[in-house]
């Protein structure tokens, strides 16, 4: 190969943000509605309503004045014209590429854990071997990839509602690539005929023949995985650490060196449909599995690849997905497509696919020392976030309903607010992710659960718990109703934050011709955009746990779910704020138990 070829991450035909690539990838063949725009008068009125409980009266009055000035300004008209023009594309959304560029490609730390998100799946495959599970999963994922290539898997229905699966178009054969002057999202929409397998930091290429049945492919893959697992060859963490550097410039330098020495190998990694990691460890708890997927002493990763399977020696699965393209709801949907189809196959008479080892440049002693330091730096970065796992079998959705509580999410967030106020005497903004896939390229919006009613209840409760709980039935219905209404608004594209983000980005990209609105500098604007408590809930029978770092330096991250079996959560906080989370968890548990015990 001519090493003077332009690297794929610098080619416009591989750049997700190139309008031609976007148009080629995303075709709204199911006529799913586009993400709606709203008049600024509408979303800014909602902004004032949602932000009022979060700021002082003085700051709120200033925000009201700033909103009025903005609505009367030339800048407002210019910004809305830009958004309206972006909304004309029926095969995208006015926000989608902005979201990719500014929410993810501007990540300043390692792509994992900042962008790569791990999801633990509990599978009905007890007793399976690592090779059996890897083969079944890979065959099913390969089949889904083929369907995506043929545009046979573009949407799904739930209770007569159609949801988009557009994110599948950019999750295969893709990768986020760190560059000092701005990250690139590489995607190859030409059909790939191979996957990459990693075991003990040795990379293997498996070319797949589509001529046989899915069962035949699974048998071939199983024999191939057995061969790879039987191979004792191992390498210390090496060039793959370029995906885990703590600076973009360092990652770019290593990537450029690697491209100059072995471009063929690099292209194999990027162009592969997906990666399968065969980990030589046995882990049991969700938290252990999630943390292992991000950092392990043997590393064994190529972070920021679109989608990866991480399978342990005791056949436990974590899906590592690049959040730039794929969020938790999409992972849950993907799991529900393939998990029910998992079954063992008879390998008698089958032939293994021949694994081809990918050849990395030789690592001399100086480079080994350098990579060892990179590994330490990455470990320090990852473990600066401390995580805890909660699993409460005594706190379930049926129990809540039996207490007369209709909306479990509203109740949980009220308890979060009480715990927060008891911990630091503050009521801060909370991010709650809301699925917007009923729109083409809709992704997520967020709701802000604090309201005047919830704030008043929290303060009453913290002052007089017994007296306040005696009047719980008087206060709670309004809190619950508002939470439900905010959720409904966010689901239909009528939230607050995405519209505010769009207005800001329209100005940001045209600030040479648009004066910066004073509204963007108000305390209220900055407060509604902050996420000291960042939360996300995915309730699914297979996707049981996931994790993410705090969004704010002094904040906490809460990945949780409640269903008929339990309440479970992975909570995160940075080391310097550890005591805050410990106190918060204690107060949260006490609050839930006290309220449930009191309610009859």
From Swiss-Prot:
InterPro entries: Carn_acyl_trans, CAT-like_dom_sf, Cho/carn_acyl_trans, Cho/carn_acyl_trans_2. CoA binds at residues 396-409. Its EC number is 2.3.1.-. The keyword Transferase applies. The keyword Acyltransferase applies. GO terms for molecular function: acyltransferase activity. Transmembrane segments: none annotated. It comes from the Bacteria. Keywords: Acyltransferase, Transferase. The active site is at 323 (proton acceptor). It is an enzyme of class 2 (transferase). Belongs to the carnitine/choline acetyltransferase family. PANTHER family: CARNITINE O-ACYLTRANSFERASE. This is Putative acetyltransferase MPN_114. The lineage of its organism: Bacteria, Bacillati, Mycoplasmatota, Mycoplasmoidales, Mycoplasmoidaceae.
